[in-house]
Design a protein with these regions (language model features):
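Ligand-binding pockets and gating/stacking loops
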Residues: 1-492
Length: 492
């Protein structure tokens, strides 16, 4: 069984019933009396009722969604730099690295992954310049993005719980290092719904060179109904497979087939209340039917002007793929899609620069710089900027020490790294928090991944302590059970 099959079979045993459901349905007679009490105390009936209500609820928000307070943003784009970009080579300039070049780091941290030897402190090979009126320092890796320095809020004090890729990607997306939790996009769709009943509310575009380590768990709905999971779009070839109706099948014939299928599925669902996978399947058939018209128009980039295609870099081989992702993202946002995630890096070609960090980061920054800057300019020009939240970052950062010989790279570093936010509700032109003198550890206004999630939810009008989902008798939250905070410095 491949990963995708395992991922969506994890909450359902082969017989189609959980152990508790089996005992409930077959534990009749006097023996059922203590069983009823046991199941009641275990939260089984409450869970079944809640699951049935949620599973049958549409993700389409026909009116203004209910929020906990006034939202500053309505939609999100998450630029995910898979592999872990180096903070000291992108947005966290450290002059002390030149001063201490060639020296051993003595900060007392347990660093390095897979037992690799810790190298010597190494300054960035890229120059940094103060950009915009704010004077925010941006690496020469980003000549286009630097023009929007006054719009960026760089959080330089990020940290997470693991230096390993798969759990790191999961934590950045779901708040947990273990598989089976709902992703950020799922939580937002659960809390706010989608604004377009003919398009998915949560879209993911991975790198054609390979998907993220950990697979579909990064956009899974976890223990939520499956209808909230991300929908995968492709950035090369057909954006969505099987989008067109097969030859010889009329729209009327297809509609009648879908209506019959829905009737049969609804009858089956009535016997299995709370079976979210089936409820999601019913909704997905209807969505797929609507997308045959809607999505065909959305993914048709021939409707864009030559100037727009050129601005996003679609005519240059190195920027064409990420440029297409960013342009598709804008078209999806315009049509009410709530959350779009765009991956950079995949397979052996990611930001995971254990060797030759200079060439690695130069390559991946060049692929993404112009497209991201073009999307920012486009959103501003089209009046979407003020209520669209942009997020940039990876699963962790990299060490300020070198790794390897010849053309050295940098190792994983989860103790301190950088991410940036921009757009709706964000105070741009500033850096929040700080790492130590050499960029190893977050020391000032430290921001855990779950603090970032709390801040994102806040900008979307949701209280991270009040946005909950009942699972196994517990009110689950994206931000987890530990005390978390909203980064007030980020807010405009």
């Amino acid at each position: 069984m491949d990963f995708h099959a395992r991922q969506f079979a994890v909450n359902r045993p082969p017989c189609g019933k959980t152990r508790r459901e089996f005992f409930w349905q077959f534990g009749g007679g006097f023996a059922a009396v203590p069983l009823i009490d046991l199941l009641s105390r275990d939260g089984f009936f409450e869970q079944q009722t809640h699951a049935a209500q949620i599973a049958n609820r549409s993700t389409f928000a026909t009116a203004t969604p209910t929020t906990h307070f006034r939202p500053r943003a309505k939609r999100v784009v998450f630029f995910f730099m898979q592999g872990g970009p180096s903070q000291v080579d992108t947005f966290d300039y450290k002059s002390a690295l030149s001063k201490y070049q060639g020296k051993t780091y003595s900060g007392g941290l347990q660093i390095g992954s897979n037992g690799r030897k810790i190298g010597l402190l190494t300054p960035s090979a890229f120059s940094f310049h103060q950009r915009g009126e704010s004077g925010l320092q941006v690496s020469s890796l980003y000549p286009h993005l630097a023009n929007f320095a006054d719009d960026l809020c760089v959080v330089r004090s990020m940290y997470c719980d693991t230096p390993t890729h798969s759990p790191g990607i999961l934590q950045m997306n779901t708040g947990s290092i273990v598989v089976g939790r709902p992703s950020l996009g799922s939580w937002l769709n659960y809390g706010l719904g989608s604004e377009n009943e003919s398009l998915p509310g949560f879209v993911v575009m991975v790198d054609p060179r390979g998907g993220p380590r950990g697979g579909a768990g990064a956009w899974s709905a976890g223990f939520m109904p499956a209808v909230y999971q991300g929908t995968l779009f492709r950035s090369r070839g057909s954006t969505l497979l099987n989008l067109r109706t097969p030859a010889g099948i009329s729209n009327r014939s297809q509609r009648r087939s879908l209506d019959l299928l829905e009737t049969l599925n609804q009858q089956h669902l009535q016997q299995r209340p709370g079976y979210s996978e089936l409820s999601a399947r019913i909704q997905s058939y209807e969505l797929a039917y609507k997308m045959q018209t809607t999505a065909t128009e959305v993914v048709d980039l021939n409707r864009e002007t030559a100037a727009t295609l050129d601005a996003y870099g679609l005519h240059r081989p190195e920027t064409a793929d990420y440029g297409r992702k960013c342009l598709l993202a804008r078209r999806l946002l315009e049509r009410g899609v709530r959350f779009v995630q765009l991956y950079s890096g995949g397979g052996a070609e990611s930001w995971d620069a254990h060797d030759d960090c200079i060439s690695n980061h130069r390559k991946h920054a060049a692929e993404t710089d112009q497209p991201i800057a073009a999307l920012i300019a486009d959103l501003q020009q089209r009046g979407l900027w003020e209520d669209t939240l942009l997020i940039w970052g990876g699963e962790f950062g990299r060490t300020p020490t070198s790794e390897g010989v010849g053309k050295p790279g940098r190792d994983h570093n989860h103790y301190g790294f950088s991410m940036w936010l921009a757009g709706g509700g964000v105070k741009g032109g500033q850096a929040v928090g700080a790492t130590d003198e050499v960029g190893f550890r977050a020391t000032e206004d430290r921001c855990h991944v779950s603090d970032l999630h709390a801040t994102i939810l806040h900008l979307m009008g949701l209280d991270h302590e009040k946005l909950t989902f009942l699972h196994e008798g517990l009110e689950k939250r994206l931000s987890g059970v530990q005390p978390r905070r909203v980064l007030r410095q980020v807010l405009a």
